[in-house]
Amino acid sequence: MRKTRVEKARQAFLNGDLETHRNLHSPEEIGKEPWHKAEQGKYIGQAVYGASDGIVTTFAAISGVAGANLSPTVALIVGLANLFADGLSMAIGDYLSEKSEKDYIKAEREREFWEVEHFPEAEKLEIKEIYKRKGLRGEKLDALVDAITSSKDLWVETMLHEELGLFEDDTSPLKSALVTFFSFVIAGFMPLVTYVFASTWTFVAEHRFALSCVITAVTMFIVGAVRQAVTGVKWYKGGMEMLFVGGMSAAVAYFIGWLLRTIFGIVM
């Protein structure tokens, strides 16, 4: 995927590359910048965080089963149940959250249009106060207020952003939920690969949890490294952070499983 000007500028900043940064801020480069996200770039955040949650929660689940020394069949059942139930729950939560936010912004936009229509002077004064607090005074302030209030659409959007702190993107709640679900399931399936295909190879069957740890660690690092597309952190730092968080979660789950087996003598 071709990097945008903003992504190149972010990388130049991280590398301390002043010359590249200067070139990216030339009038020609700024003029070529598309001011709307490409369709495939809108849902990167959901995909990355869905994958992160999927692999961590699933691996923690089977680690708990391994710590309790339960059968591989139990691990597979628990892992798959956790994978699809948590994935669906997360996707539904994502959908409801985004839809609620969009509905709220829509209602606030309608209210602001109504106020601009019925109380224009009061709303104009609010715009003036907003920018006065930002340090503008005199003719510059008056000119800016006149420019903003000359368009009702711009006027209302400014009130939404500056007064209410509301910003709306053009992502689809349904698409966002689907991206979250499938990224969760795909990444979350990786810790279960050795359990699913254990019957095919004897070596895999004998070392399924150890091999699952290796596969999961590699996948966690990759998912963490990809996070830099969203957070801007160094790829190796993102990978190590993800590996640490996932490892700690799995270690705690394994310990709890072992502790319960020791206390209650669970055997399955």
Residue ranges and their predicted role:
Residues 85, 89, 187, 191, ...:
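Alpha-helical transmembrane segments of multipass membrane proteins
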Residues 48, 52, 56-81, 91-93:
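Juxtamembrane transmembrane-helix termini in multi-pass membrane transport proteins
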Residues 81-105:
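Hydrophobic alpha-helical membrane-embedded segments
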Residues 40-62, 167-193:
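Transmembrane alpha-helical segments and their cytosolic interface motifs
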